Amino acid sequence: MSEKQQSSSIIEEFGFPAEVIQLLDRTGVTGEVTQVRVRVLEGRDKGRILTRNIKGPVRLGDIVILRETEREARKLTTKR
């Protein structure tokens, strides 16, 4: 197995690294979840920009590991 194939199988086993490029909003009952835009750094969707919800502290430039890159978070709506 070549080194490139081995590294891609490791990435798919643990998740896909993505960089936080924009903080959008906070959600959840107490604001514990942050909606962010991330750019996928490796894997089959490399370069794709996704909207995801992240629980816990997060800053611009952070690297997060996504288990999958198929789903996107829904846009937040405000109650009237």
Swiss-Prot record:
GO CC term (a single one): cytosolic small ribosomal subunit
Keyword Ribosomal protein: yes
Gene3D superfamilies linked to this entry: Nucleic acid-binding proteins
Keywords of this entry: Ribonucleoprotein, Ribosomal protein
CDD domains: S1_S28E
UniProt-listed GO biological process terms: maturation of SSU-rRNA; ribosomal small subunit assembly; translation
PROSITE patterns: RIBOSOMAL_S28E
Family designation: Belongs to the eukaryotic ribosomal protein eS28 family.
Name under which the protein is recorded: Small ribosomal subunit protein eS28
Organism for this UniProt entry: Metallosphaera sedula (strain ATCC 51363 / DSM 5348 / JCM 9185 / NBRC 15509 / TH2)
